[in-house]
Amino acid sequence: MTERRKMNLAKVSGFLSASFLLLTLLGDTTEACSCARRHPQTAFCSSDIVLRAKFVAVNKMEGNLSERRWMYHEIKTIKLYKGPEEMQDVRYVHTPPIDGACGYFHGGPLKEEYLITGRVKGGRVTISICNFIRPWAEITLAQKRGFTSEYSKGCSCSIVSCHSECSITSDNQCLWTDLLRSQNQSYFQDKHLACLPRAEKNGMCTWKSLGTQRSGSFRKRRLTQ
């Protein structure tokens, strides 16, 4: 093999290595992002941090090549419902790239109160479109009660999403049937109920109304729909 051919191969190899590194850092921008809808109690229990805050500004993040595509949102924390004690006053939430990485871009009005759930990584709060992020004004009174005090009591329970025929397999489960087409997408369980352990039933998890209805009216049903 001639020296020139060796040099050309070395250049090609170097280019491919650099390209692979770049793609690794930037990620696959063609990858579609999809998130399954979750009951707000599931969103609460699976999150590292839950807070009520106002979005103040959106900025691009400074940093190395892998970080430049991230953004951070400046927020004003109003109330921390769940999270580390040292994060009582979160000022920034970070989000991954918008294209294909489930990044969250706040397109709503600024200085409006939002309920925000997220993860804590390396002392940094991160959010995505898969997190429960919703205007506080759109959250029902029952959901507000849930985020404030009740959902935390049911984190030992498991809410099972029911898209078709389904049934529970243990006493710590509640069937979430809002996603069935027959329910006409009213999302009643989402908006008004919490899955909580009941002392009088030896810790068995059942649906409980967080609204004005009688608490025993919406107990868990052992459905086989």
Where are these regions (language model features)?
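Transition segments tied to proteolytic processing and entry into folded domains
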Residues: 2-225
